[in-house]
Structures are given as C-alpha cells and as structure tokens.
C-alpha cells in the first residue's frame, strides 16, 4: 500500500466513523428546517469557462448530498478596488461603490450557510476582479459571512495555482471561517474553455470538496463557528 492509498483509506475509515457517530445523513436541513445553501462565486470573466466546470462539478455533488447551491458570476465588467475610505464602517453592510457586482454579492452572504470562491489564475494570482469583490464585500458585510465554512478553487493552464489558492484562502482565515479541504489542493487544470472537464483527478477533488463541505454543514447544523465569542477584540500595534 503506497502513501496515497494509506491516506485515502484512513480518511475514509475516519469519515465513516464520524458519520455513523453523528447521524449527519439526516441533517441536510438546519434546525429551522431550511435546506442549507452554499454560495459559490465564479471569479472568471468567462461565464462558461473552466472555473464554471469546477463549480458545476461541486454543485452537482452538493445536490447529491441534499445541499442547495447558487453560482454567482462576477461578470466581465470593471470592478472597483477598495480605496480604504471607511464608508462601510459608517454604513455597515454596503460598500459606497454601488455601480458593480460587489454589493449584490455581499447581500447574498446572509442567506448562505457556506462560501466557495473560484478563480482562474493570471500571472500566478487570482483574477484581480474577484479579489476586489472579496475584499470589499468582506470589509462591508463580513459579519454576514463570518464563521461560516469556506473553500477556494483555483483553475489554471499550468502553474501558479497553489499561490492563487493560498491567496483566496487568506480572507477566510481572518473571518473565523472553517476552511474546507479535499483529497488534494482544490485545483483544476485546463486551458481552452471546457478543457478542465478532462482533468479526472481534479474533478474528483471537486467532488470530495463538496462531500466534505456537506459533511461539515450537516455536522454543525449550519451554525457558524464561534470565533472569540463574547471576548472583546484585543488589538496590538507594534509601531509605537
């Protein structure tokens, strides 16, 4: 048995034990009886490109597990970057720039139980537009998504996927969001539109991600992670 086989068999055994112990198969609905939902952001300028292939595969597997999903495309129009004006601190829940997709996406945070962000790789980085959306939406309406499970997906032709994957995960870890993993980094390979559908291992990784996301939502009943709970925030500035 090689290392990968050992890891997979161990993970399957542990997962089976956890499922049996918690009875999560019966928990597709949260305590209010609402079917849980994953918001997925397609951060590609191409609505039906390879990022869509990845998110569609996740959506299909979520449905198998009884979890709803919605894919929101950021579009291919200009998206403003954050200018650190502080307007969202004076008017929480809304970015002062209301002429692009950002506020419409952040409005969907409240009704979502989890978040998945997918992006193509440009020069070893995620698409700049999706980074602008996430930064502004998290600043202005982060309270609505804080503590909810999250995952990132990077799609590339050849290289830069791991760096992009790490960049996309950064905001989640600052918002008390449990980051959901898979059997490998959440990466899919493809150049021409639709070519990622040939990446059989990558597609399996997407399905495993969907299974893990479903398991976590069912195990927690869709309840966000507590973070620091009622403890006041304690900041520290090393510049005196």
Question: In which residue ranges do the predicted regions lie?
Answer:
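C-terminal segment of N-terminal export signals and the immediately downstream linker at the start
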Residues: 22-54
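A short, Lys/Arg-enriched amphipathic alpha-helix followed by its capping loop at the start of a domain
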Residues: 57-67
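A generic structural motif
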Residues: 65-70, 177
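N-terminal secretory signal peptides and thylakoid transit peptides that target proteins
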Residues: 1-14
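Glycine-rich phosphate/pyrophosphate-binding loop and the adjoining helix
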Residues: 178-240
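Helix-loop-strand module that forms the ligand-binding subsite of alpha/beta enzymes
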Residues: 36, 90-184
């Amino acid at each position: 048995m090689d290392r990968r086989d050992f890891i997979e068999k161990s993970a399957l055994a542990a997962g089976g034990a956890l499922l049996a112990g918690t009875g999560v198969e019966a928990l597709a609905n949260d305590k209010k009886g609402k079917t849980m939902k994953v918001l997925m952001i397609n951060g590609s300028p191409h609505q039906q490109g390879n990022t869509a292939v990845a998110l569609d595969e996740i959506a299909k597997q979520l449905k198998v597990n009884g979890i709803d999903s919605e894919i929101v495309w950021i579009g291919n129009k200009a998206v403003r970057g954050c200018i650190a004006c502080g307007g969202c601190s004076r008017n929480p829940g809304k970015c002062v720039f209301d002429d692009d997709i950002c506020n419409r996406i952040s409005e969907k945070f409240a009704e979502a139980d989890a978040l998945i962000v997918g992006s193509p790789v440009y020069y070893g980085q995620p698409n700049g537009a999706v980074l602008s959306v996430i930064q502004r939406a998290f600043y202005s309406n982060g309270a609505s998504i804080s503590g909810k499970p999250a995952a990132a997906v990077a799609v590339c032709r050849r290289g830069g996927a791991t760096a992009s994957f790490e960049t996309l995960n950064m905001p989640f870890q600052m918002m008390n969001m449990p980051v959901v993993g898979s059997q490998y980094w959440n990466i899919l390979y493809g150049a021409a539109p639709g070519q990622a559908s040939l990446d059989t291992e990558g597609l399996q990784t997407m399905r495993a991600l969907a299974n893990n996301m479903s398991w976590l939502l069912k195990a927690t009943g869709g309840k966000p992670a507590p973070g620091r709970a009622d403890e006041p925030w304690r900041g520290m500035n090393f510049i005196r």
